[in-house]
């Protein structure tokens, strides 16, 4: 699979240098991407996910530092314009919905094969993570993005991982 178009921007960390991704001529090697990486992962698998992650960062004008970040509301634009996602991809804020409505939105997205990118913030910082499943008890499965640390099922009203990596609330 290939993406669409290209994008160039100048992150401040490069002091005037630029990063460019040519999504339309890049073949994303999904078959080589693994659910978990370790010291035994092949170079091809590491390169496949590294290229995707670099392009994801470029697509949202990632601000790189020891705690990198980007604005969440640009993610739908990037998914549609560069990665050929359905135009219906949307940015929604939790505060605009009741608990029941929010749960239904998450379950509907997952049922339709669309994991949900979510974010959380505290005075200590912010972090993006992914809802990629749910169970019969109304718990959502969270991939926190910390190499598997603390992944598991949580209530959306109690997203408190026991151990936290970069961007956690502790």
Regions found by a protein language model. Give the residues of each.
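Cysteine-nucleophile protease catalytic domains, especially the papain-like/related folds used
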Residues: 1-93
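Weak global preference for isoleucine
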Residues: 13, 58, 75, 105-106, ...
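Intrinsic disorder/low-complexity segments enriched in polar/charged and small flexible residues
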Residues: 9, 32, 104, 146-148
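Cys-His-centered catalytic/binding microenvironment captured across papain-like cysteine peptidases
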Residues: 111, 124-125, 135-170
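Active-site-adjacent substructure of cysteine-protease-like catalytic cores
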Residues: 81-143
């Amino acid at each position: 699979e290939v993406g669409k178009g290209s994008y160039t921007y100048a992150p401040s960390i490069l002091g005037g240098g630029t990063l460019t991704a040519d999504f339309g001529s890049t073949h994303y090697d999904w078959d080589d991407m693994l659910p978990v990486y370790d010291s035994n992962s092949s170079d091809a698998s590491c390169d496949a996910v590294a290229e995707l992650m670099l392009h994801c960062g470029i697509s949202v004008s990632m601000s790189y530092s020891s705690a990198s970040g980007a604005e969440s509301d640009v993610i739908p634009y990037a998914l549609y314009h560069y990665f050929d996602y359905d135009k219906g991809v949307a940015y929604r804020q939790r505060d605009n919905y009741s608990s029941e409505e929010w749960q239904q939105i998450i379950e509907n997205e997952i049922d339709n094969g669309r994991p949900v990118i979510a974010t959380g913030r505290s005075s200590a910082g912010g972090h993006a993570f992914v809802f990629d499943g749910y169970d019969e008890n109304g718990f959502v499965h969270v991939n926190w993005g910390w190499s598997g640390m603390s992944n598991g099922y949580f209530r959306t009203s109690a997203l408190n991982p026991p151990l936290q990596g970069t961007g956690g609330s502790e």
